[in-house]
Amino acid sequence: MSKDDEKRIGDENHPKILQAFGGEYNDPALQGYVKSLGQLLAASSELPDRKWTFTLLDSDVTNAFALPGGYVYVTRGLLSLAETEGQLAAVIGHEIGHVTARHGAQRHAQGTLAGIGAAGASILGSILVGPEAGRTIGEFANVGALGYVASYSRDQEYQADELGIRYNGRIGFNPQGMAQFLAKLDSEKGLVAKLRGQAPKGSSYLDTHPPTPDRVKRARKLAEKSLVDKPMDGRDIYLSKIDGMIWGDSPDQGYARDGSFAHKNLNIFFSVPDEFTLFNSPKNVTAYGPDNAAIKFDMGPKNYGGSMRDYIRQTWARNAQLSNLQSIEMNGLEAATASTKGRVNGRSMDIQLVAIRGKEGHTFQLTFYSQPQKTKTLSEVYRRTTYSFRHMSLDELEKLKPLRIRLHKVRNGETIESISQMMAVKKFAVDRFKLLNGVKQNSDLIVGQTVKIISTE
């Protein structure tokens, strides 16, 4: 693959990456920070004169990746997890390493890519660890920009680690930044499992290619060989940069919190059963429950002219065998429902479809999945979710605001548990606080230390 081909692949797929990951994060100062750090690292690489493009994506998925042609991406989810400038620099340096070593071009030449549209791969071993930790591989593949995972071989990942550590050291950062961040990701698996609840195994990037302890050990050994005089971590400046950054769902994608989903722009609200865990993505909202039960919310075409009953029969499920097709009304909204059957992840499932006509011509879709032997048990809780769907009042709309990373200085007598009570996210608040700040026990807290919390302010 020529350098012109690499540039073409990057140019063609950059818009697809933006679409898949919520676009650029709307914060010029933070975008500028990521770009300046990236350019500084690129200048220390083997390709300092290449045109590099660094983008902070508006996604809470913890991820970073690169495209051939010098395109490098990090998500705000990754920024929220990192603790120091050195850790972020290590991740960006790793991605630059994939580009300078032409790993994407090598994989393409070997025929291991699922088409040019799949030219971007997760750098950290295909990791998904943020609040959206239940999102499926298919959601990214369908966008076309990330049609595969684990595109890089183990040796290529090792080489990118080595190059990233080298670039980090050249500009004076602590070369242990990569090992620190990989270790943090590895220790995060437990929280992912709790968040995901009963989500199917293999549904996340983390399941597919977790960072191994061997890779962490190797990164530590490489860092020990990198001689840096007075290495910088840049913790304080880094935390000051991300203070106020959105954590979790962005306003444009709605908010999945505490068992309910609310979207200000669409003016909709619905809740899911207590035992289900919600995950939000640019394409849909999913909720996983026990025994492979699941709920999916997404949208159909706008300004459909027929009834919702006709919409199910003639458009949404026109190729399915339907039963119990009927019109219903819920909270003043025209709707229809029908039953069908299908296979999901190799399992036979009963499927309930609900189509809803909303304001401004929107068509909303709720899909309920259950194993046949569990359908009767789940029918009532699924019915409650269906009839919880409604538009919101002006007062409710006004109160909808994103969660943000805020800084807090540890005071005398405070503990992990007491500070965690300040968190706006109540579910697994202690676990989240420990993960955000890299602390495991109260003795890790120091009076006067700055820590991250999640706040509504």
What are the residue ranges of the model-derived segments?
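Short alpha-helical segments in extracytoplasmic peptidoglycan/chitin-binding modules
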Residues: 416-424, 430-434
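Hydrophobic or amphipathic, alpha-helical segments that drive membrane association/targeting
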Residues: 1-63, 146, 249-250, 254-256, ...
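Membrane-active amphipathic alpha-helices enriched in small hydrophobic residues
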Residues: 112-132, 136-148
